[in-house]
Design a protein with these regions (language model features):
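Acidic, proline/glycine-enriched N-terminal capping motif
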Residues: 2-142
């Protein structure tokens, strides 16, 4: 699973009607909480999370500076919207895949931390697209 140039059909950075920029991260976002594995010493991420992170690391890295530049226009804590496009119709909790995305946003320097002093997460209604799952990330004005 590699989300490279074959995702060129969708512009990763898009402007919506309100003028806010949106960033597209392809791939069905797994829960970093569910499915953790015990090694005997500590927990490690599930295979699904490890596969997702390997497939999306270049995309997160590519948009780091652009996201940080946009973030400078907002006061902390910033309201960030997550719109999940699910690849299956399985039930899910918004918070679990959002935690995966927020962890990656911290890892790649999009945000300093994902605690309440830095981010107020918001959610749009999820949609379903078996061929093109992913998540839209948008910085909202307060």
């Amino acid at each position: 699973m590699n989300y490279g140039k074959e995702w060129a059909w969708m512009d990763n950075l898009e402007n919506n009607n309100m003028g806010n920029k949106k960033w597209w991260i392809p791939g069905n976002v797994p829960s970093s909480k569910n499915g953790r594995r015990w090694t005997g010493k500590y927990f490690i991420a599930s295979k699904a999370v490890m596969t997702y992170r390997k497939a999306t690391k270049d995309i997160y890295a590519e948009y780091t500076e652009e996201f940080k530049k946009e973030l400078e226009n907002h006061e902390l804590p910033v309201k960030i919207s997550f719109e999940f496009v699910r690849g299956s119709r399985h039930k899910f909790d918004y918070l679990n895949p959002a935690q995966t995305v927020q962890d990656d946003m911290v890892k790649y320097g999009w945000i300093e931390d994902d605690n309440a002093e830095f981010i107020i997460p918001a959610f749009e209604q999820y949609t379903y697209n078996k061929e093109n799952p992913g998540v839209w990330i948008e910085i909202l004005s307060k």
